[in-house]
Amino acid sequence: MPDTFFQPVSGFELPRFAGIATFMRLPHVGLLDKRLNDVQIGLIGTPWDGGTTNRPGPRHGPRQLRDYSTMIRAENGATGVRPFELVNCADLGDVGPNPADLHDTMARITDFYQKVK
């Protein structure tokens, strides 16, 4: 029996356009959350433009993916697979970058991922 905490919010329970956007309408589990060790697949955003030149905007990617992913369904229509019943997935939030300091941003990303391990 899958842990219902890690199931996406149903569109029947809360319309897809409502609520706080998380990746695929999964629960948000922060680094200090007691359920962090139960997460098997954690989705992490890194809203940062420093990896591109002449193309600002990647910093908006994680937020947009969260918004667009609200349309994901709990069951794959072609295969019938219900992936969220197979593993515990959660949105672990964003790494907080330092837009003015590349080295500090890399240290923050490294620190965030080490805390997730």
Q: Positions of the model-derived regions?
A:
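Metal-dependent C-N hydrolase catalytic cores
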Residues: 2-117
